[in-house]
Amino acid sequence: MADSHGNAKGATAHTEAGGGHKAPFPPFQKDTFASQLVSLTIAFVALYLISSRLALPRVRKTIDDRQNKIEGDIAQAQTLKNESDAALKAYEVELAAARTRAQAIGNETREKLNAEADTERKALEKRLSAKLADAEKTIASTRTAAMSNVRGIASDAATAIVQQLTGAMPDRKLVDSAVEASMKG
């Protein structure tokens, strides 16, 4: 097997230029500078054309699509906001109308109940006044009956007392007038 590393006949071990002189770095060589500028210009023009024809339209389309999507979303959000504002206003109007109706119903019911209560109170007062008048008549007739009974009892008692004390029966008219005078005064 042959040694493949550096021992072949006629092969130089290094790629250096002979004479110990080193060549300058290729991009800095003056004789290739113009051709390098042309190559660089061609590469940049090709890169510009490729990016402007292929990559930039895709990026521009993506940006435009995103912008359109954002604008559409903003428009939809504004539409929904306007609808919700309109619904809120309609709700507030309905709520105010419902409050007004509830207050009117409450006032009407209150007035109706007050009128019914006044009617019932007046009817009750009439019944109570009639019962009171009947009771006063009953009391007056009972008092009159009781007073007439008291006069009779007082007259009988006075007659019995005078008879016991004097032993003689007093005059009934005289005893009745004395009892009447003592009851008045």
Curated annotation (Swiss-Prot):
The alphabetical list of record keywords is:
ATP synthesis, Cell inner membrane, Cell membrane, CF(0), Hydrogen ion transport, Ion transport, Membrane, Transmembrane, Transmembrane helix, Transport
Q: Name one GO cellular component term.
A: plasma membrane
Keyword Nucleotide-binding listed? The answer is no
How this chain sits in the membrane, per its record, is: Single-pass membrane protein
Q: Which Pfam families match?
A: ATP-synt_B (PF00430)
Where is this protein found? Cell inner membrane
Subunit and partners:
F-type ATPases have 2 components, F(1) - the catalytic core - and F(0) - the membrane proton channel. F(1) has five subunits: alpha(3), beta(3), gamma(1), delta(1), epsilon(1). F(0) has three main subunits: a(1), b(2) and c(10-14). The alpha and beta chains form an alternating ring which encloses part of the gamma chain. F(1) is attached to F(0) by a central stalk formed by the gamma and epsilon chains, while a peripheral stalk is formed by the delta and b chains.
Q: Which function does this protein serve? A: F(1)F(0) ATP synthase produces ATP from ADP in the presence of a proton or sodium gradient. F-type ATPases consist of two structural domains, F(1) containing the extramembraneous catalytic core and F(0) containing the membrane proton channel, linked together by a central stalk and a peripheral stalk. During catalysis, ATP synthesis in the catalytic domain of F(1) is coupled via a rotary mechanism of the central stalk subunits to proton translocation.
State the family named in the UniProt similarity comment for this chain.
Answer: Belongs to the ATPase B chain family.
Q: What name does the UniProt record give this protein?
A: ATP synthase subunit b 2
